Regions:
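Phosphate-binding/switch loop-helix module in NTP-utilizing enzymes
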Residues: 75-104
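Conserved lysine of the Walker
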Residues: 14
Length: 177
């Protein structure tokens, strides 16, 4: 299982890019999973539903299952938030895990940069040695591979090479130092 982060500031286009590349990777036969980090509380069920009521009553875990999908909700109840590595261990077998968020964990990542949104914020690269490529709407002065924010096909091709272990060949020769 390969792990690849998609990192950038809020509003840079991470989710949109991920939505575009997943179907291309799946079409080529890759089994893709995703972990998204939320900086805020979130709900996956609704107040008043049985599963919500069971959680409110004190269950640590509630698993909801149907013929289409299942979801496991785990209440931390004051316990520390699990690390990315702990969350990765919970996933089933797959070829690629895309990680949205956890931008400071030591995993290879593609940085997503939008000039208007991120103009006053520093790029993660070159300060982040885990950035292996950049998807951007403006040319950047970097030796890393660069892709247009709208060029999902090129990003997907780079990711396929990464999954196949050919990431070094997917990068320009000058960037292999």
């Amino acid at each position: 299982m390969k792990v690849l982060g998609i990192a950038g500031y809020s509003g840079s286009g991470k989710t949109t890019l991920i939505e575009k590349i997943i179907p291309l990777l799946v079409r080529d036969g890759l089994r893709v999973s995703l972990i998204k980090h939320a900086h805020h509380a979130f709900e996956v069920d609704y107040p008043g539903k049985d599963s919500w009521r069971h959680r409110q009553a004190g269950c640590t875990e509630v698993l909801v299952s149907s013929a289409q999908r299942w979801a496991l909700m785990h209440e931390l109840r004051g316990a520390p938030e699990p690390t990315l590595q702990e969350q990765l261990a919970r996933l089933g077998p797959c070829d690629l895990v895309i990680v949205e968020g956890w931008k400071f964990d030591p995993i290879p990542r593609i940085e997503v940069h939008r000039s208007g949104t991120d103009a006053r914020r520093p790029l993660l690269y070159p300060g982040d040695p885990h950035v292996i490529a950049v998807a951007t709407d403006e040319p950047l002065d970097t030796r890393l591979p660069q892709f247009g924010l709208d060029d999902a096909a090129a990003v997907a091709q780079f990711i396929r090479a990464f999954v196949a272990g050919r990431e070094a060949r997917a990068r320009p020769a000058a960037a292999a130092d």
